[in-house]
Structures are given as C-alpha cells and as structure tokens.
C-alpha cells in the first residue's frame, strides 16, 4: 500500500536489537516504538534506512573497498570466476550481462547465493545447485564476505522479528517453516559513472539497474557514501532519490513479504542511475524465506480492511528460479 512519500525514513533499531531474542520483547516500550516505525515505513514506502544496527562503519567500508578492488582488476582476471549455469548462476557478470525486463543493465557484479548441494531441494533446487565462486584476489575476499553474510543474516532475522510484531503476529512468525532456514542472495555491484569524451559528457551507462522489485523478504543495502544513484518510485510515479546516509543500511521489502502481508506492505519499484563521475559500489544482501516455502498471506491478513483481494500462493524457490533463468544473456 505505497503512498506519495517524498523521503525515506531513518529508524534507530538499537532498542529492537537489544531485546530481539527476549521472550518478552513484545512488552518492551523501546521495541514497540521501533515496531511502530517499521510498520509505518513498510506501509507507506516499503523502504527505510536503519541505524543502530551494530555494524562498525569500518566494516561496511571494508566490504565496499574489497569489492571495488576486485572490479578494478582486468577483465581476464575477473573472468576467472565468470558466472555459468554449471555454478548455479554464481560468479562474475560483465557490464550489460544482467537483464531487467529485457534491457541490459549497465553494471558489473558478482552474484552469490546460499550454497545448494546436489538434491538438497530435489527438482525445485536443480538450477541453483552449486558453490560460490570467490575471487583469489584480493586474498581476504572469501573470509570477509562469509563473515559479512553471517552478520547480515542475523541482523535481517532480528528486523524481521520486529516486522512480525508490526503485522500483528508473534516475533517467531517468520521462523520455523517460513524462514527458519532462510535462503540468501548477495550481489556485489559496480556501476560506472559518467565519462568525458572529446570534452563532452557521455554516459557509459543509462540505467545502471532497471526498475524492479526484490524477490524475497528483506533487503539490506550497503552503498557508497558519496554517490547519489538509488531511486524509489512512489504511488504517483515520481522517482524519489534515496541518498547515502553514512553508517546506515537501506532496507526494503521484497515480493514474498508483500504476499505475507496481503499487499499491506509494498515491494516498491526502484532503480539505479549513476549520473556521478564516480564509480559506485553497492553490496546488497537479500534475506529470503526457506527455499521450498509456499508463501501465502498470513492468517491475520487474509481479509483486508479495504477489500477482499488476496495475493496468490507462491513457492519462493520457483519464484527465484524463474527470475534467474531470464536475468542473464549469453550464458
């Protein structure tokens, strides 16, 4: 239920994190205030910044810097971990290889997924079977990113406990069969900026990433502090800039949470246009449901106050696989 929002709220989630695993968290005034803010943000914009998340700013920067160093390597070096179907669509994509709604995106990226072993999810998971392809250069890459994924997973789980309360359920609503064994996706993305050719500004890229919604439950975006590029569309169709706020994550709602909330929470369209001269790095962590979970509106949201519309059931793994199989060219 998006609105004509003109800015994106900043939420201090430290009171929620302090009590996130307390059986009585729903009775804590500090938690309830955060829950109220989460509910408002998810209902009105589908986007919000979080501060007080516990990640040192030095770690956020290190993750971006290591990613940037990889993208500065030669194509031949980067292609050593080239994405292939045999790797479960994990690895490096060159500029223009990712497709959004049929149009090449002007970014390069490394795609990582929770690793899927043979027959882990039966036929449902065949496409995603494989291990992540981590660069050997920089040498710290694999250890740093695996630690970062673990921290992001824990943070997202705790935010989802607050969102569960906001939806009128128990804090455990998105654990167990829904997201007790969550799948995850991480994209490390580089967006070239504007170059100067013959004294005239020429865009190497038009749309760094075309307008889209995210697939899962909750997204955590760690973006460069000095480049405005992310834009979010409000109900009137206006594109609202989501400028970097140092030390924060940008969070947004995915398609699966929209279904769980029966449309109360919006998986809002967003895009990236880098009109800056600087190369932009973003590291995006996607917290998902269990891979084989059948997602349908929560019992508390099957009858909507403003009508009887109900979102249809979707199996997350099918939803993800369908997107992955149409997102790339020349693979």
Curated annotation (Swiss-Prot):
Cofactor note: Binds 1 Fe(2+) ion per subunit.
Lineage: Eukaryota, Viridiplantae, Streptophyta, Embryophyta, Tracheophyta
Known role: 2-oxoglutarate-dependent dioxygenase catalyzing homoarginine 6-hydroxylation thus producing 6-hydroxy-L-homoarginine. Guanidine (Gd) is in turn synthesized by the spontaneous conversion of 6-hydroxy-L-homoarginine to (S)-2-amino-6-oxohexanoate (RHEA:79843); guanidine is a nitrogen-rich compound that can serve as a defense or signaling substance.
Keyword DNA damage: no
UniProt KW keywords: Cytoplasm, Dioxygenase, Iron, Metal-binding, Oxidoreductase
Binding site for Fe cation: 212, 214, 270
GO cellular component term, pick one: cytosol
Ligand binding (2-oxoglutarate): 280
Catalytic activity: L-homoarginine + 2-oxoglutarate + O2 = 6-hydroxy-L-homoarginine + succinate + CO2
Subcellular localization(s) per the UniProt record: Cytoplasm, Cytosol
Cofactor(s) this protein cannot do without: Fe(2+)
EC number, as in UniProt: 1.14.11.-
Stretches assigned to the Fe2OG dioxygenase domain: 182-289
Gene3D superfamilies per UniProt: B-lactam Antibiotic, Isopenicillin N Synthase, Chain (2.60.120.330)
Stated family: Belongs to the iron/ascorbate-dependent oxidoreductase family.
Molecular function as annotated in GO: 2-oxoglutarate-dependent dioxygenase activity; metal ion binding
Major localization class: cytoplasm
Taxonomic source organism: Glycine max
Name of the protein this chain belongs to: Homoarginine-6-hydroxylase 2-ODD-C23
